[in-house]
């Protein structure tokens, strides 16, 4: 049985780390198989059941993308970001993406990879967990805490209470 607190406690973790938490009695191989099935189902489900976006997300991303490059780095599985962007009508606003499911690398390395691949000279990472803050630090870029999200930050360079504060 899983409760809301379990979901919040697992936000930002890789799918395999979530699997270890949810299924501690399974072997690593059994856990991998279960999580692969969950990830496939989740990606398929998301195509026809897009998530609920924060207020004005589409308008804010459209506005920001006219002046700045928008990039997404996540600890999610392969395909999740693409499906999410497509199902929510946001694909046109994002220039590049990377995730743990594609590379098997920690988020900090994936952030660094996106920065290098896109020749970014000035950037910052917006996230809502301490793990996001640590990943931005590992990549050597400033971290802005999205306080409306799931977690806390210790020393962000800035804090936003809503997505609209980025415009």
Map each language-model feature to its residues.
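Short, small-residue-biased leader/transition segments that mark boundaries at the very start
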Residues: 2-4
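A metal-dependent, Asp-based hydrolase signature
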Residues: 9-45, 63
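Short beta->alpha linker loops
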Residues: 10, 52-56, 76-77, 102, ...
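Alpha-helical elements of Rossmann-like donor-binding domains used by nucleotide-donor carbohydrate transfer enzymes
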Residues: 17-21, 37, 59, 63, ...
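A short acidic, helix-capping loop that chelates divalent metal ions and anchors anionic groups
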Residues: 18, 42-46, 80, 151-154
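Asp-based, Mg2+/Mn2+-dependent phosphohydrolase catalytic module
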Residues: 29, 78, 82-167
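Short, acidic loop-to-helix structural element flanking the phosphoryl-transfer center
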Residues: 32, 44-72, 78, 82, ...
């Amino acid at each position: 049985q899983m409760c809301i607190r379990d979901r919040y406690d697992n936000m930002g973790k890789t799918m395999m780390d979530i699997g270890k938490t949810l299924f501690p009695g399974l072997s690593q191989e059994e856990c991998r198989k279960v999580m692969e099935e969950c990830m496939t189902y989740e990606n398929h489900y998301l195509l026809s059941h897009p998530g609920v976006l924060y207020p004005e997300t589409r308008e804010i991303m459209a506005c920001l993308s006219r002046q700045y490059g928008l990039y997404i780095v996540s600890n999610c599985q392969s395909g999740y970001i693409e499906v999410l962007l497509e199902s929510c009508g946001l694909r046109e606003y994002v220039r590049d993406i990377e995730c743990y499911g594609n590379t098997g690398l920690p988020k900090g390395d994936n952030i660094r990879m996106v920065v290098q691949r896109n020749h970014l000279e000035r950037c910052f990472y917006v996230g809502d967990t301490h793990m996001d803050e640590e990943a931005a630090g590992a990549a050597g870029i400033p971290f802005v805490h999205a306080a409306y999200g799931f977690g806390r930050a210790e020393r962000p360079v800035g804090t936003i209470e809503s997505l609209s504060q980025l415009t």
